[in-house]
Amino acid sequence: MNASRIAAAGASTLTRRIIPCLDVTAGRVVKGVNFVNLTDAGDPVEIARRYNEQGADELTFLDITATSDGRDLILPIIEQVASQVFIPLTVGGGVRQVSDVQRLLNAGADKISINSAAVANPELVRAAADYHGSQCIVVAIDARRSSAEGEPARWEVFTHGGRKATGLDAVAWARRMAAYGAGEILLTSMDRDGTKSGFDLELTRAVSDAVPVPVIASGGVGNLQHLADGVTTGRASAVLAASIFHFGQHTVRECKQYMAERGIAVRLT
């Protein structure tokens, strides 16, 4: 991590972070609803540069079909972005072994997100954290509500871009991954993804309260209040969004100003 990224990461530990998410497939940024019906949103390098200029705290790149398609890592895209963007980059998709973590770090990533491979081989998370440090390792959890109305809330973990049910309880899985060395949990509600109806705040709060590491709330942001709710009601350390940024509804700067006006500590530039 270069000096400017270290400074950005250090400042963000004292504030709530706003993180644009770039879902990538076939070299393009896409956005769907409930993990399907993908719409092209543009070139990843151009979009990353725009969010960097708007004052994003970090960027998250997720190759959403790398694992299901059996493809390699998106190294060329990350190399291009890292040469032009000076905030922390989290990259996920197609990570299968510790050597993949090293390859992405060498390409310019600052943190590596592990999702399907963590379920297939939980020891990968422990090994990667032991070798590279927990601060580099993010475990991504895609969760869908599995409890019926009136029952105690439960959420099931899905892998392979939301295509494969695992039978794992999301809260228990998050707790286990934190114990294995994950430095952050990236928590996406599959039920809310792309719906613009707001985070699943019950899910976000349940996981945030269960783990001793930062939780990044994801899935469902449709307006500025949703971002604030993720922090205040969901108790997330960071909020991640895509649609409201990609299609010009709001800028990162507008989101930060809104949160600051409501007493939420954010990094203003």
UniProtKB/Swiss-Prot annotation:
Its EC number is 4.3.2.10. Pathway: Amino-acid biosynthesis; L-histidine biosynthesis; L-histidine from 5-phospho-alpha-D-ribose 1-diphosphate: step 5/9. One of its GO terms (molecular function) is lyase activity. It catalyses: 5-[(5-phospho-1-deoxy-D-ribulos-1-ylimino)methylamino]-1-(5-phospho-beta-D-ribosyl)imidazole-4-carboxamide + L-glutamine = D-erythro-1-(imidazol-4-yl)glycerol 3-phosphate + 5-amino-1-(5-phospho-beta-D-ribosyl)imidazole-4-carboxamide + L-glutamate + H(+). The active site is at D23, D142. One of its GO terms (biological process) is L-histidine biosynthetic process. HAMAP family: HisF (MF_01013). Belongs to the HisA/HisF family. IGPS catalyzes the conversion of PRFAR and glutamine to IGP, AICAR and glutamate. The HisF subunit catalyzes the cyclization activity that produces IGP and AICAR from PRFAR using the ammonia provided by the HisH subunit. This is Imidazole glycerol phosphate synthase subunit HisF. It comes from Bordetella pertussis (strain Tohama I / ATCC BAA-589 / NCTC 13251). The lineage of its organism: Bacteria, Pseudomonadati, Pseudomonadota, Betaproteobacteria, Burkholderiales.
